[in-house]
Amino acid sequence: MSCFENRGDAATQAANDYNPFEAMAPRTPSKTPVERRNGRHVKANDIPPQGVYLPNNNYLAPHMRSPEYVQLSTAAAITLGIMGGRMYGCSCTRCLNLLLTYPEGCRANCAYCGLARHREADRDYADRNFIRVDWPAVPMADIVEIVARDPASSPFHRMCISMITHPRSEQDTFTVLKQWTDRIGPDAIPVSILSNPTTMTRDDVQRTKDLGADTFTVALDAATPALFDRTRGKGVQSPHKWSKYWEILLDACDVFGPGHFGAHIIVGMGETEYEVLHLVQELVDLGGHSHMFCFFPEQGSLMDHLPATPRDQWRRVQLARYLIDYRDVRVDAMRFDSAGRVTDYGIGAAELSAVIDEGVAFRTSGCPGKFRDDISACDRPFGDSPPSDIASYPFQPKSRDLKKIRRQLGIPVRVE
């Protein structure tokens, strides 16, 4: 698992306890040489895949396509036994994260993403880092065969299919989903869909449910329309629109129902805490959940020069989000300062202290697993931070972790 260092301006980061909008502008995408566009050289070389492909930019990538091939996270590959390695603090991941793959790659150009279209200038799609780690490519049939041997005893509590912006994304998602559910029942390992709203319809949302998915998520990522446009839309020559993402999110609300849909949100790209927590409340009021990521500059992205989210900003939002999502605290009961930072969480000091000491609020958030509704199966080990300064804990925080979290929150004194 690769862990890239934050290349942001340390002085800027030290001076602020939040990332303001004006300081988080992405670079302008550069033009890709014609011969590198749409995976042309990968298709021209047409090297046949030989089983598992481990990303290596020093070799010509083989010609791999979904639905026959999918990529999976480094953590999932280690847990599945496909590649060696260990993860700090945890022996496995509880979510089998799958990613559709094509030589053409993702046709969107999101500023913070390692899979963005502009990266075709220097790196094949199969070799790009995503959420800070490599994603080996594996035949889907091999993955199903391994898990289907004994799904009830599998370490995985959930499987997730991540779509990308590609003309075949919907149809191939249906094929991969059916291949899985034909062999592995949802009671043993439920399935989530991380959707691509730009190319989807309401009928597509319905079909994922009909084929056995139990949870549907939309990666809003940006907390406001302006931030979305700057990082995911025309600001970076990308096709996504805030309105279309919300259209599919509301379709998921209708089709999947309360507790079975949600949205990804990245904290620290220029929104205020007030803005992101009002979005969290809006999702809860619809019956959904928020799945939060701490911004960490992805190597090779258009934002890899920018500072990671300061830990105090992240911890405030993490804690407030948990209270809204799982403890029935409303954002209207919270207080914010003139910069939109949380100053009061809307509950008493003793109750707040108990929530902090339990530690669950600071674990990775995502679709639920089999332990508790508020403990995510999708633990994404170190996907938004290095192990030396953990943002989202993929394991239960220990006593020393909670002491550090309290310092980051500015709440050092435990109330008895």
Predicted region positions:
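N-terminal [4Fe-4S]-dependent radical SAM core
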Residues: 3-4, 24, 39-109, 114-135, ...
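Core AdoMet radical
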Residues: 117-146, 150-172, 186-204, 208-246, ...
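Short, electropositive alpha-helical surface patch
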Residues: 173-182, 214-217, 270-289, 344-359
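Surface-exposed amphipathic alpha-helices with a cationic face
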Residues: 177-186, 209, 249-257
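Conserved C-terminal portion of the radical SAM core fold
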Residues: 214-215, 220, 224, 242-302, ...
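Flexible glycine/acidic-rich beta-alpha junction loops that bind and position SAM and/or redox cofactors
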Residues: 225-236, 268-271, 289-314, 327-353
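C-terminal accessory regions of radical SAM enzymes
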Residues: 312-396
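C-terminal non-catalytic accessory extensions
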Residues: 384-416
